[in-house]
């Protein structure tokens, strides 16, 4: 079955280690191959069985089925490409859009050099790096949410409308409701 190692309590080295709370590897049953040689296959086969079982019992589609004869009105990338897509969509010059996309990793690489932090200082007290990270996260979320909206609402996220648009909407509703 397995190899079991019995401790020799007359061994002075083992007694000294046991007095310090060490020496646990001198006795007991080793994990390899006794335990792990049957735990690994059980876990792997169990994971495969659960995956196949869920796929058979609940076959849910991922997204809409593809229709090669109908092109969608607006083609959107996957959600994790939304900020990049929004940059390319809003910048009029495509070369400038590509340069802006390249400046994001270049700017991220320069953030650690903005502050002088010695090795004994708390790394969590870095106000410039923290501010740049928070602003970068907010801008990425703003660009990502804006990419899912139509182009005319993408920069304001549909939260703000100009007074002219609001007045025209009011006039249109007044016109149609006056005939009801």
Swiss-Prot record:
InterPro entries in the cross-refs: Cyt_b/b6_C, Cyt_b/b6_C_sf, Cyt_b6/f_cplx_suIV, Cytochrome_b_C_euk/bac
GO cellular component: chloroplast thylakoid membrane
Subcellular location: Plastid, Chloroplast thylakoid membrane
Transmembrane segments: 36-56, 95-115, 131-151
Domain of life of the organism encoding this protein: Eukaryota
Membrane topology, from the record: Multi-pass membrane protein
Gene Ontology MF annotations: electron transporter, transferring electrons within cytochrome b6/f complex of photosystem II activity; electron transporter, transferring electrons within the cyclic electron transport pathway of photosynthesis activity; oxidoreductase activity
Family matches, as Pfam families: Cytochrom_B_C
Main location: plastid
GO BP, one annotated term: photosynthetic electron transport chain
PROSITE patterns: CYTB_CTER (PS51003)
Chloroplast keyword on record: yes
Record's keyword terms, sorted: Chloroplast, Electron transport, Membrane, Photosynthesis, Plastid, Thylakoid, Transmembrane, Transmembrane helix, Transport
Family: Belongs to the cytochrome b family. PetD subfamily.
Function: Component of the cytochrome b6-f complex, which mediates electron transfer between photosystem II (PSII) and photosystem I (PSI), cyclic electron flow around PSI, and state transitions.
Subunit structure, interactors included: The 4 large subunits of the cytochrome b6-f complex are cytochrome b6, subunit IV (17 kDa polypeptide, petD), cytochrome f and the Rieske protein, while the 4 small subunits are petG, petL, petM and petN. The complex functions as a dimer.
Name used for this protein in its record: Cytochrome b6-f complex subunit 4
Organism of this sequence: Pinus thunbergii (Japanese black pine)
């Amino acid at each position: 079955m397995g190899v079991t190692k019995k401790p020799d309590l007359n061994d002075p080295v083992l007694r000294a280690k046991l007095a310090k709370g060490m020496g646990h590897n001198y006795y007991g049953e080793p994990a390899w191959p006794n335990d792990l040689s049957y735990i690994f296959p059980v876990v792997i086969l169990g994971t495969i069985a659960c995956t196949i079982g869920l796929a058979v019992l609940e076959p849910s589609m991922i997204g809409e089925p593809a229709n090669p004869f109908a092109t969608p009105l607006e083609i959107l990338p996957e959600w994790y490409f939304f900020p990049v897509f929004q940059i390319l969509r809003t910048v009029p010059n495509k070369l400038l859009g590509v340069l802006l996309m390249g400046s994001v990793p270049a700017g991220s690489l320069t953030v650690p050099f903005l502050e002088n932090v010695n090795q004994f200082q708390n790394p969590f007290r870095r106000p410039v790096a923290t501010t740049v990270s928070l602003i970068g996260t907010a801008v990425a979320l703003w660009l990502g949410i804006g990419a899912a909206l139509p182009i005319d609402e993408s920069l304001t996220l549909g939260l703000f409308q100009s007074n002219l648009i609001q007045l025209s909407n009011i006039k249109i509703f007044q016109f149609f409701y006056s005939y009801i």
